Amino acid sequence: MAPIDSVLSSQLKNIQRTLNYHASNPIDVFIVNKAAEMKTEKVKKQPGSVSLLSGQIIINVHASTQDIASLFRKECAKILVEEMMYGGTFQDKVKTNNLISLPEWLIPGLQHYLAYDWSAETDNTMRYIHDQYGLTNFDAIPSIYNDVKGASFWKFVAYKYGPNAIPSVLYMARVTRKFNASVYYSFQVSANELFEDWQEFYDYGYLQDQKKPNPVNGVMLS
């Protein structure tokens, strides 16, 4: 178990550093031996103990180190971002969730970005979105691509404004309760201006890459 413990500890530190936020409650991780137990495992707690988290992280011990790390990052990101945005208790989450207005792609996109960074698969999907739908209207991209288009937003702001851009947007979103306001107070530009820059960033990248064969499953064709 030592190698798994080392991997999880390292991944948690990386996510906390990216978000500039540390969980106020312990994150429970349970290792199971069979894939079926991923859905059926029931956690037995000691008498008098109460978990304030919305869920635990359950990992299949037989999965590859890469799969374990990706799953852990995704679930950790979900726990940390939800706590950061909505509070650590059930009462806080119910109260704050009704007050903060965020695009439906924002948080799932961040979870995807923190879990997989900018993987070949994510880039392939974003390239397809660019070719199929264009990037003129961010909101017109179908919602089935919320994870990827959201991840593309976070990748762009981190590239343009630096690593502190991610926690800045999240913090200002919680304070102002509005996405557009969080963008303005974080970067002193309007959301429309930011998405124009986002479009230019990806248009330029993919247009420069047009002469190269499209990758298939992350493998570049010769």
Where are these regions (language model features)?
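Second-shell loop/turn segments in exported
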Residues: 1-3, 57-67, 95-101, 138-144, ...
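Zn2+-dependent metallopeptidase catalytic core
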Residues: 1-29, 73-76, 80-83
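Beta/coil-rich, acidic/histidine-enriched accessory regions frequently appended to metallopeptidases
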Residues: 7-10, 175-222
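Surface-exposed patches in mature extracellular/periplasmic domains of secreted proteins
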Residues: 14-30, 88-93, 124-127, 164-170
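Active-site-proximal alpha-helical
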Residues: 15, 105-106, 110, 114-121, ...
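Acidic helix-start/capping segments at beta-turn-to-alpha-helix junctions
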Residues: 23-40, 97-98
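Charged, often glycine-rich, active-site loop that binds/positions anionic groups
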Residues: 35-51
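Zinc-dependent metallopeptidase catalytic helix centered on the HExxH motif
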Residues: 49-121, 167
